[in-house]
Amino acid sequence: MNPTHVIQQRLEEAWSLAEVLTAAYDAFDEMLSAFDRYQNGPGPFYAALIMAGPAAAGGRNTIGMAPSLPPPERDGPRSPEQVDEPSAQEVAGAVAGLAALAARKLCMAATAANSPADRSACVSGAQYADEVRAFMTGTGP
């Protein structure tokens, strides 16, 4: 199972505000990692990857400022997984799905957040996630 699918599963299973924030932060971080792997090569998704990068970074940074985001766990360095390198089209599809799920979960978390700062982070994070999804599906600005 590749990292994108692992994070997507964690995001699907997240229910508490802290779980959603943690999984959404990791989702944005994984989006940025995926973009880094494909940004140097020409291809049909090159422009979308370049355009979606700032939105993913903005989402990660916004979620990172949420008061209810727990401190990161220190498990030590992760060993790289051996996975087949997906095509840029497969990456775009996986990132679009992850971004759509993040947007939905963050919208749900925003309604349950007690703190205005948490609510704002969830709403802004959902907007950034939707922007990433739009770029990856070709429906962006």
What are the functions of these language-model segments?
Residues 1-42:
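Leu/Val/Ala/Ile-rich N-terminal alpha-helices, chiefly Sec-type signal peptides and the beginnings
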